[in-house]
Design a protein with these regions (language model features):
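NTP-dependent nucleotidyl-transfer catalytic core
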Residues: 1-193, 198-201, 207-213, 226, ...
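Conserved nucleotide- and phosphate/pyrophosphate-binding catalytic cores
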Residues: 204-406
Length: 406
């Protein structure tokens, strides 16, 4: 199976400008394509992960990726998919974020001679002459057409600044510049970027009389139509200091049953034959599928060792696995009363709660688990035999301890 057909089977393609041309280019390893990343934060997120894996798939098929760091366009802010204006960042913030992106992307994509290249659009956008740009590029854009673009429609009622209105022109200019300077003949991006990408192909056609192509990637949404990649309203980061490998693993381990196979098909590099077989799994087997998804993605982002440790930690906490990677809290015989220790004492001794009253409050609010079971009885106690084997306690989502009597 060739790469274009694989992308179709994995459900990754949303829209294309010229299907046959794109099909032939990427199947024959003739595409030099780019994907842009505006550096609005100091880390990539799970939302970017989709684009990174696409770049990897296409590179493995012989095509050459161009990773565009949006050091210049970030100063404007992309209005696509937003109902409010993005926070303005300083040049220093943007430069710092761009460097963070560079370091992270080098972990996923192979850069070097005749491999992937990385460019920053600040290198050409910041030196543009405004009058020259208006004369050379502005004449190629119809305001009427721009206002009909989906990326602007959502903002018209709340107000769209002239600054943001220029974003389409800047992104289109990126494609034009990359086509001229690097022979970049194709752009990939999220489905919400379609209007901006068409602007680039049109600019190249009008200015150079050449054909360039665009393809959008299917947005990763759950069964309710909501974008995936956030937990409790917070982004799932690829930086281990912002989202730990364990939390990253748990995010994917906890996807809904209805979403797990979609995620495996779109995000992992497992063979399609294996995925088709997994798609027949039901009931308890879906938990195995979720473990597979979480392990494969964590391995890609954080490495095999971290993925294995996260999996073992999750299994220890939620049952059935080694407790090697769960932090220990050691207690002694002197901590027992009549050969037992109650749950509130263990929460305090382990450092999971500051006091017995804090422990009581957490239990009453449903925030304490022993293994996989929620603790509801504040008088629950454990004898010496249980404690010598070790008891895994959890407070909230991120605080775990294995309490062991030694």
């Amino acid at each position: 199976m060739q790469i274009y057909e694989e992308l179709v089977r994995r459900g990754l393609i949303a829209q294309v400008t010229d299907e046959q041309e794109i099909h032939d280019l990427i199947n024959n390893g003739k595409a030099r394509f780019y994907i842009g990343f505006d550096c609005t934060a100091d880390s990539l997120t799970a939302g970017h992960f989709m684009a990174l894996t696409l770049m990897k798939r296409l590179q493995m098929a012989g095509n050459q990726p161009v990773a565009l760091i949006g050091g210049g366009t970030t100063m404007i802010g992309d209005p696509s998919g937003r109902t409010d204006m993005r926070k303005m960042l300083t040049k220093e913030d943007i430069d710092h974020n761009a460097e963070c992106f560079r370091r992270q992307m080098e972990r996923f994509i192979e850069f070097g001679e005749d491999k992937a290249i990385m460019v920053n659009n600040a290198d050409w956008l910041l030196d543009l002459n405004y009058i020259e740009l208006l004369r050379e590029v502005g004449t190629c854009f119809s305001v009427n057409n721009m206002l009909r673009a989906e990326c602007y429609k959502q903002r018209m009622e709340k107000g769209l600044s002239f600054l943001e209105f220029n974003y389409m022109i800047m992104q289109s200019y990126d494609f034009y510049h990359l086509f001229k300077e690097y022979g970049c003949n194709m752009q990939f991006g999220g489905d919400d970027q379609w209007s901006n990408m068409l602007g680039g192909t049109e600019l190249i056609r009008k200015k150079l009389g050449k054909d360039a192509y665009a393809m959008t990637i299917t947005l990763l949404t759950d069964s309710q139509g909501k974008k995936m990649g956030k937990t409790a309203g917070n982004a799932v980061w690829l930086d281990a200091n912002k989202t730990s490998p364990f939390d990253f693993y748990q995010y994917w381990r906890n996807v809904d049953d209805a979403d797990v196979m979609k995620c495996i098909r779109m995000l992992t590099f497992l063979p399609l034959e294996q995925i088709d077989e997994m798609a027949t799994w039901k009931d308890a087997q879906l938990n195995t599928a979720k473990e597979t998804l979480a392990y494969e993605l964590t391995k890609m982002v954080h490495g095999e060792d971290e993925a294995g440790a996260a999996q073992e930690k999750a299994r220890a906490i939620f049952g059935g696995g080694s407790t090697e990677h769960v932090p220990e809290a050691v207690i002694s015989e002197s901590d027992l009363a009549d050969g037992k220790a109650d749950i509130m004492s263990l929460l305090v001794l382990s450092g999971l709660c500051a006091s017995r009253s804090d422990a009581r409050r957490n239990i009453q609010q449903g925030g304490v688990l022993c293994g996989e079971e929620k603790v509801t009885d504040i008088a629950k106690a454990f004898d010496g035999e249980e404690l010598r084997k070790g008891v895994v306690l959890r407070r909230g989502k991120k605080n775990f301890k294995r309490v062991i009597l030694k």
